[in-house]
Amino acid sequence: MILVLCFILAYFIGAIPFGVVIGKLFYHTDIRKGGSHNIGTTNAYRMLGPVGGSIVLVLDILKGTLAASLPILFGIEHHWLVLIVGLAAVFGHTFSIYIRFKGGKAVATSAGILLAYNPPFFVIAFAIWFSLILLTSMVSVASTLGMVLITAWSLVYHDWLLTTVACGLLVVFLIKHRANFKRIKAGDENMVPFGLGQYLRQHRGRS
């Protein structure tokens, strides 16, 4: 019964659309009505600026961490349940009951699950993700490639549960980023205003 409660609470925690909440409360802006119309961190940066975007990023990570940690908080001593219950938060973020079962791409929320499951691995994954952003200037590419590398890393360490969950999340990322991949192919994917990719695009535009 407690485990069922954990799954339900994890869904409702994961479903909190912090991008929408922060935008409306502090910026009087609905980020769903501009940019990519997504509720996640990238569009929050675009619509709310670096401070608002950073707040959304941290909150989306922490809600994944809190949701995944529910079994531990309720005294269930099976660490592997952190990953399983955490998936309910990903489902909540992707299909949020608060915004008519629409949602984001669950990148930050997935990172929060990893933080609860293996904090050192989270630090490594975050460093990889940020390095890929500096290299490509595209969050979509950094998120997808980062998940591929996390999956490979978990294979090296024979963490089969993490490998399975990472593979599942990779499929979700690929599906949710389909529009991004089409824009990449067309050469007009949105970029962050820094990094090598942005520099090269600007340099080509001047030549």
UniProtKB/Swiss-Prot annotation:
**Example GO BP:** phospholipid biosynthetic process
Keyword list (alphabetical) reads:
Cell membrane, Lipid biosynthesis, Lipid metabolism, Membrane, Phospholipid biosynthesis, Phospholipid metabolism, Transferase, Transmembrane, Transmembrane helix
- Topology in the lipid bilayer: Multi-pass membrane protein
What is an example of a GO molecular function annotated in this UniProt entry? acyl-phosphate glycerol-3-phosphate acyltransferase activity
- The superkingdom of the source organism is Bacteria
Localization, per the record, is: Cell membrane
Report the enzyme's class at the first EC level: transferase
E.C. designation(s): 2.3.1.275
Keyword Heme on this protein?
A: no
Return any one Pfam family short name: G3P_acyltransf
Which GO cellular component does the record give, naming just one?
plasma membrane
Transmembrane stretches, by residue range? 2-22, 47-67, 72-92, 121-141, 155-175
- Give the catalysed reaction(s), semicolon-separated: an acyl phosphate + sn-glycerol 3-phosphate = a 1-acyl-sn-glycero-3-phosphate + phosphate
Q: What does the UniProt function comment say about this protein?
A: Catalyzes the transfer of an acyl group from acyl-phosphate (acyl-PO(4)) to glycerol-3-phosphate (G3P) to form lysophosphatidic acid (LPA). This enzyme utilizes acyl-phosphate as fatty acyl donor, but not acyl-CoA or acyl-ACP.
Under the subunit heading, UniProt states: Probably interacts with PlsX.
Instruction: Give the family this protein belongs to, as stated in its UniProt record.
Output: Belongs to the PlsY family.
- Record's protein name: Glycerol-3-phosphate acyltransferase
Give the originating organism: Lacticaseibacillus paracasei (strain ATCC 334 / BCRC 17002 / CCUG 31169 / CIP 107868 / KCTC 3260 / NRRL B-441)
